[in-house]
Amino acid sequence: MVKAVAVVRGDSKVQGTVHFEQESESAPTTISWEIEGNDPNALRGFHIHQFGDNTNGCTSAGPHFNPFGKQHGAPEDDERHVGDLGNISTDGNGVAKGTKQDLLIKLIGKDSILGRTIVVHAGTDDYGKGGFEDSKTTGHAGARPACGVIGLTQ
């Protein structure tokens, strides 16, 4: 079992933690999160980005992690970036809390997400179907108010 965590924060009030667990390279990765400070009753884009560089804030994290050269899509789509985790849903207090499993996200192997950045976006991910200029690359999810580098944990 490999476990990882990202402490998410930024220039806004958005903050929290994201945990990852994977039993083996062929097993799905379980992702769980608790993030506060978002707008209430909202959907917020949630993506793993290429770099673990936050020297210039969350913009230094680069584009979505996309080792297979695909277009942006929904988590359940065949055509998607590895880093496309879709949206997280906030409650009436602006807290997003949940768990999901994903077969493309790896903690083990050459396409590992370790050392990369998880980003909470300011807008809703349109899953590449919104018709905006950036829909097929970013899901038109907007600014990056909070992020954290994914690192090993016990």
Swiss-Prot record:
Zn(2+) binds at residues 64, 72, 81, 84. The keyword ATP-binding does not apply. Its cofactor is Cu cation; Zn(2+). SUPFAM superfamilies: Cu,Zn superoxide dismutase-like. Cu cation binds at residues 47, 49, 64, 121. Its EC number is 1.15.1.1. It is found in: Cytoplasm. Belongs to the Cu-Zn superoxide dismutase family. This is Superoxide dismutase [Cu-Zn]. The lineage of its organism: Eukaryota, Fungi, Dikarya, Ascomycota, Saccharomycotina.
